[in-house]
A protein has these predicted regions:
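Mature, structured domains of secreted/extracytosolic soluble proteins
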Residues: 2-205
């Protein structure tokens, strides 16, 4: 079922969201793996965020940009109200520790509105299927930090699920497959996060 597929690709890894972009001169290749040396330097935490949804991010506290920059991705995501459904999915898949302990990753994190596009009954079923949920969530996570420049130029990015996602820029808007980036270049202690408006679907689902 189409909605089920969308839900399945619904980032278990995305749920664990994280961010920390590297400079454009050291952007990792699509084949970069977890812990790639193309990680961003500490100064990346000062990177500029972009997108219409960034204005909704809390101005202070653990859920603010500065607050999330000091926490590992899953923990940082739990402090952002717009990512509560993703966080629930990450917990259901048992990926919290995996995401928090990962080194230098990129997370394409579906926001609550993205999950709301999925029928409640379908979403509930997916959240109860750990294997399927994990497949979806890991399709939202890449094993290296990717900069906005990389997303704009379009080289495919390999995910931890095994398949690739295709980033691009259309009319000034960053996209990943069929999803729009609504708040990008969000930094966490171990990841760079791009919040998206649609749950991604692995091609094999």
């Amino acid at each position: 079922m189409k909605y089920r597929l969308l839900a399945v690709s619904g980032l278990a890894a995305g749920l664990a969201l994280s961010a920390a972009a590297c400079s454009s001169s050291s952007s990792p290749s699509a084949a970069s793996g977890p812990g790639s040396s193309a990680s961003a330097p500490p100064a990346a935490a000062a990177a500029v965020n972009f997108g219409p949804a960034c204005s909704a991010v809390p101005k202070s506290g653990a859920g603010s940009f500065s607050g999330m920059a000091t926490a590992p991705v899953a923990t940082a995501a739990s402090a952002n109200p717009a990512l509560s459904t993703l966080v629930a999915a990450v917990k259901a898949a048992g990926l919290v520790d995996t995401l928090n302990s990962a080194s230098n990753i990129t997370v394409f994190a579906p926001d609550n509105a993205a999950f709301a596009k999925i029928p409640p009954a379908t979403l509930k079923k997916v959240l109860a299927d750990k294997a399927e949920l994990t497949k979806i969530l890991t399709y939202h996570v890449a094993g290296a930090r990717y900069t906005p420049d990389h997303l704009a130029s379009g080289p495919a990015i390999k995910t931890l699920e095994g398949a690739t996602v295709m980033p691009s820029m259309m009319g000034g808007t960053y996209e990943v497959n069929n999803a729009h980036v609504v708040c990008g270049n969000v930094q966490t202690a171990n990841a760079t996060v791009y919040i998206i408006d649609t749950v991604l679907m692995p091609p094999s689902s």
